[in-house]
């Protein structure tokens, strides 16, 4: 499946790159938060190949041992690399119990540029300013707009028509 670049969201992340805010990407399930984080990671790596990116995806069983805030906090700190720009990407952060304690602790250390995604009702409805002690920048990701849907559908339709005409 072809990845549809959603430039409006990527540009928002690029604009806050390196700011001290905790960047929070929210949206309903399957709206493209994880794909946005992947695209942003690719952008960062192309601009700063020497950086250190600590990525945790709680959708994968590889990270089941990090489901407590203390384990998450310790894991990130164990992967810190002094002398490099350190980024933390945590996908579906709400799956970690008391995740805000880990995120607040990492943010307070001032060693990381932090990006998290979440999709549960608690994270979507909560006041992020009270959940996180530091400043936050929220990007709300929505499912495809009608224009995006039509662009994908038209591309698929054209490929199908071309195949039939051969």
Question: Which residues does each predicted region cover?
Answer:
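Pre-Walker A adenine-sensing motif
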Residues: 5-17
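Short glycine-rich substrate-engagement loop in P-loop NTPases that contacts/grips substrate
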Residues: 56-83
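Structural recognition of the conserved hydrophobic beta-strand(s) that form the central parallel beta-sheet
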Residues: 113-119
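Short regulatory helix/loop adjacent to the ATP-binding pocket of P-loop NTPases
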Residues: 123-136
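Conserved lysine of the Walker
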Residues: 33
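Hydrophobic anchor at the beta1->P-loop junction of P-loop NTPases
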Residues: 25
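Single conserved hydrophobic/aromatic residue that forms the stacking wall/gate
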Residues: 156-166
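Hydrophobic positions on the alpha1 helix immediately C-terminal to the Walker A/P-loop
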Residues: 36
